[in-house]
């Protein structure tokens, strides 16, 4: 975005998680801002072209106008080449563990392999949410349901329930953290009572991982209320609700164990123990522009 010359924002709030340092956000860009709420237009970023209305009608109208243009798409070639260059220079990568420990990135890769990339995936908020975005390569739209920048811990499990009820023939997977799952853990009872076939995979790192990462990087490791010294045994907790549950600790068997869980009839909870101190990158430090992201 830092090098964009035009940004078309659809329902965006331009909050600080997107912009970083506001007065240095996309300095060369013109902004088209579409929102149903006029109060959001130009609230944080001045809109050069404000459009107030429902995207359900606005986007088809804009698409019709765009397709009527005889645009020279070859003009995009240098820009696309530049993007490919960035991908080669800054690939998503991580240092895999030398033993059988499960890295959180690998957990998502394993889940992608186990599901064949065909599941509807819901997620909560935190590191696991970012890793789902990076390592579960969604082949088509409307496959990932999350609360985005709203930061709604506890969203993932109810969203998975709704997705499964709405799309009963689709495989539905909830990826959550050991913090987020406890925000709405009572909905395990809903899954069992109504026999809603969702598969829940807890990325268990023993902490509120995203907050811990911020305190590590920006608060001199002054940790406060982020490590879970006492957490429930999630397998026993799920079983107490009458749900089948598995614990996964070995990366060499992870894909097969995930496949077995996915093939188990009815709702299932999987407690996946991942390396506890892994950080998710890249990220924008507080008060910094996007071009100076960490990692």
Language model feature labels by segment:
Residues 1, 25, 41-52, 56-62, ...:
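Thiamine diphosphate
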Residues 1-79, 258:
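Glycine-rich, acidic loop regions that bind phosphate or pyrophosphate groups
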Residues 5, 11-14, 59-70, 83, ...:
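Structural signal for hydrophobic packing residues in well-ordered secondary-structure cores
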Residues 10-11, 125, 176, 273:
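Glycine-rich, N-terminal phosphate-binding loop of Rossmann-like dinucleotide-binding domains
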Residues 72, 84-89, 97-100, 286-295:
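Conserved acidic/glycine
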Residues 74-81, 124-125, 271:
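Short coil/turn segments at secondary-structure boundaries
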Residues 82-158, 163:
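Active-site diphosphate/adenylate-binding microenvironment
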């Amino acid at each position: 975005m830092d090098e964009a010359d035009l940004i078309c924002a659809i329902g965006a709030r331009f909050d600080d998680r997107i912009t970083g340092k506001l007065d240095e956000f996309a300095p060369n860009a013109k902004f088209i801002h579409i929102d149903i709420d006029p109060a959001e237009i130009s609230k944080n970023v001045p809109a050069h072209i404000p459009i107030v209305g429902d995207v359900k009608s606005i986007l088809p109208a804009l698409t019709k106008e765009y397709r009527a243009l005889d645009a020279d798409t070859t003009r995009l070639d240098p820009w696309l080449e530049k993007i490919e260059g960035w991908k080669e220079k800054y690939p998503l990568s991580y240092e895999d563990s030398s033993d059988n420990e499960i890295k959180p990135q690998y957990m998502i890769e394993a889940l992608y392999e186990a599901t064949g990339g065909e599941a509807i995936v819901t997620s909560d908020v935190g590191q696991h949410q970012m890793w789902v975005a990076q390592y579960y390569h969604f082949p088509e739209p409307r496959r990932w349901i999350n609360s985005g920048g709203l930061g709604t811990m506890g969203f993932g499990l109810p969203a998975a329930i709704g997705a499964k009820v709405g799309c009963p023939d689709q495989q539905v997977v909830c990826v959550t953290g050991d913090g987020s799952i406890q925000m709405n853990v009572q909905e395990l009872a809903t899954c069992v009572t109504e026999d809603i076939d969702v598969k829940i995979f807890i990325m268990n790192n023993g902490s509120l991982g995203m907050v811990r990462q911020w305190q590590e990087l920006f608060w001199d490791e002054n940790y406060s209320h982020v490590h879970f010294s006492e957490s429930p045994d999630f397998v026993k907790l799920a079983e107490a609700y009458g749900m089948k549950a598995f614990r996964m600790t070995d990366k060499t068997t992870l894909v097969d164990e995930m496949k077995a869980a996915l093939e188990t009839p009815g709702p299932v909870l999987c407690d996946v123990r991942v390396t506890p101190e892994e950080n998710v990158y890249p990220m924008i430090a507080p008060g910094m522009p996007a071009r100076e992201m960490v990692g």
